[in-house]
Amino acid sequence: MPLKGINVLELAGLAPGPFCGMILAQFGASVIRVDKIYESYNAIDCLGHGKRSIALNLKVNEGSNIFRKLVNQSDVLIDPYRPGVMERMKLGPEELMGINKKLIYARLTGFGHNGPYANMAGHDINYLALSGLLSLFGRHNQKPTPPVNLVADFAGGGLMCAFGIVLALFERSKSGIGQVIDASMVDGSAYLGSWFFRSQNVPGLWGNPRGKNILDSGTHFYDTYETKDKQYMCVGAIESKFYEIFLEKLGISSHEMPQFENFEESREKLEKIFKQKTQAEWCAIFDGTDACVTPVLNLKDVASHAHNKERNIFKTEDNGLVTPNPAPRLSRTPGMSKKHERNAKLGEHTTEILTELDFKPEEIVNLIANGIINQGMKHSKL
């Protein structure tokens, strides 16, 4: 796999950091999750499969010294804490990159490491709001609607951070030294929205209130419709040639339903039409055509769809949980899902990792007794 041989330390946190670490792990990196000694995100971290866990008390010298030894053998550190947290423990970039000049110190935060909001708490909805993108989501005459915590947390945050890490690794192959990555979820979300910012003056695309433009459900030919069996079909017939095919499959002429006129009237007609057949019946009509009409699948049904099944996009676990396989697909060195490996328990690999660092058994026993490490035998406070 492309990242084989890359060692990553992931300081335990909420979803964006674990997602970043998961991407690196699924493409070959060896990832150690550094948990707080008695505080575990294990119950809510669904992205820790294939990682190892060491539980350390970083607030005491013995714990931070162990962490420094890990850093000395690592290529990447993922830091999800607010600005100043690592510095107060003397584990900031200046200290750690002094130990390991090749270290890539990836700092993944909501608002970034400087600016008036840098030290504020926040979540996906807050970062998306500040990026300007939240203002685009929602129906006409309705308030902005958050599209679950996908854009800022995972795309603008975890994925963008992983991209930065890969860029830094590539640059290091030439310079021989690491660097600090400031991966802000506001920055990342805004950058994801580059096309929206740059297309504001494209004729016909924007210029109307939210929910009244071509790409935000403002038209009848770019929307979703309920079917007879309470499922949904989505329509994205933007180009005129595709719109003609769409109408043809419905048995409607362009004179009856012109593309760029009477949007609401046409939407009402389509709502009635789509309720006349089930989702499966509509798929039988539109599949294999250029009408740009596809079913809206739920998370349980995606694996059984013919297209997804042939491409092996998803896998179904023994417990029935459906999960996606790694993307993109590399022809020689593809990623590999770690889902078959269970999520590591807090401190489960502490002894194993310390042994690799040449700690003796009696030293490990003393570290446990002194509350410096946790090897997973105690109950964690959630």
Give the residues covered by each predicted segment.
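Active-site-adjacent "lid/gating" segments in soluble enzymes
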Residues: 23, 27, 87-233, 237-238, ...
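Aromatic-enriched alpha-helical interface/lid elements that frame and gate functional surfaces
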Residues: 220-293
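A glycine-rich dinucleotide-binding beta-alpha-beta segment and adjacent secondary-structure elements
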Residues: 288-340
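A structured beta-alpha segment of the ubiquitous adenosine-cofactor-binding alpha/beta core
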Residues: 9, 47-99, 275
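Eukaryotic N-terminal low-complexity, Ser/Thr- and Lys/Arg-rich leader segments
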Residues: 1, 378-382
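Glycine-rich phosphate-binding loop and adjoining beta1-alpha1-beta2 segment
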Residues: 26-58
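Conserved small-residue-rich beta-alpha loop and adjacent elements
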Residues: 2-39
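Flexible, small-/acidic-enriched active-site or ligand-binding loops
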Residues: 318-368
